[in-house]
């Protein structure tokens, strides 16, 4: 199976909502790793609406010191009910970021072992280049996706990172982009030409539906019908179709990258 990492050059283009959306549409067991070191867990605060007291990434530092990192990981992940998704939640405060730097390299080895054993791993790496950034995960995933919007500011911020990620790519490691809101105003072809990277897929621009994944918001209501109608409309939405298509494209690209290593 595959280790797939999503990261942003700047701002908040929608990495977390996209990772969660892809995971919740994944056709087989998948582990989500919240590796964004910049603040408290966005997943616990957002998707799980302020859930507190759950173990997570920071608890693995002590396990690593004791030489039991691989054994400790299953004990600190949380399972999402009625899904095949489990989540390793991130840091609790920004002050923990420097301490995370020591865990990324050994955690990479554990995650690769998990992927080799048949479980996919999706990493939310947050913004590139910040203190405590999970550089080893970004550099050595089967597939790294640079997530950005399609406006000029996003392209300008992503340009140097696209060049750096391409230059650092090793055999078996693929780097592509994932565009949130293609055509606002630039096309996938424009993005690819500017950054010198292929565009894996585009995720629809739909902040209201993205909030369902990022913030645990209720699904948009329909004019007729109650929650069941809202569920059906959400499942049939162009946004969710784009999330599913992005996940399928990511699985194929990661598989191809692994075959080429």
Cite the ranges covered by each PLM segment.
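Helical mechanochemical/support elements of P-loop NTPase systems and associated helical scaffolds
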Residues: 103-106, 153-157, 235, 239-242
């Amino acid at each position: 199976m595959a280790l797939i990492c999503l990261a942003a050059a700047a701002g908040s283009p929608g990495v977390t909502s996209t990772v969660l959306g892809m995971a919740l549409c994944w056709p087989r067991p998948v582990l989500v790793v919240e590796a964004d070191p910049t603040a408290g867990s966005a997943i616990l605060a957002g998707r799980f609406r302020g859930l507190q007291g759950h173990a997570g990434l920071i608890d693995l530092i002590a396990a690593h010191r004791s030489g039991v990192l691989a054994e400790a990981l299953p004990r600190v992940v949380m399972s999402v009910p009625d899904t095949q998704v489990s989540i390793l939640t991130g840091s609790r405060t920004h002050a923990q970021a420097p301490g995370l730097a020591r865990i990324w390299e050994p955690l990479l080895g554990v995650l690769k072992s998990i992927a080799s054993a048949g479980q996919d791993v999706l990493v939310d790496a947050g913004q590139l280049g910040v203190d405590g950034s999970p550089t080893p995960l970004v550099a050595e995933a089967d597939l790294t996706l640079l997530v950005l919007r399609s406006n000029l500011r996003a392209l300008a911020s992503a340009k140097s990172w696209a060049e750096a990620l391409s230059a650092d790519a090793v055999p078996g490691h693929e780097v592509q982009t994932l565009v949130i809101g293609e055509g606002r105003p630039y096309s996938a072809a424009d993005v690819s030409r500017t950054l010198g990277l292929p565009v894996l897929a585009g995720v629809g621009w739909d902040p209201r539906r993205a909030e369902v994944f990022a913030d645990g918001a209720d699904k948009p209501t329909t004019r007729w019908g109650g929650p069941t109608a809202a569920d059906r409309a959400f499942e049939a939405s162009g946004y969710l179709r784009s999330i599913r298509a992005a996940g399928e494209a990511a699985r194929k690209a990661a598989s191809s990258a692994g075959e080429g290593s």
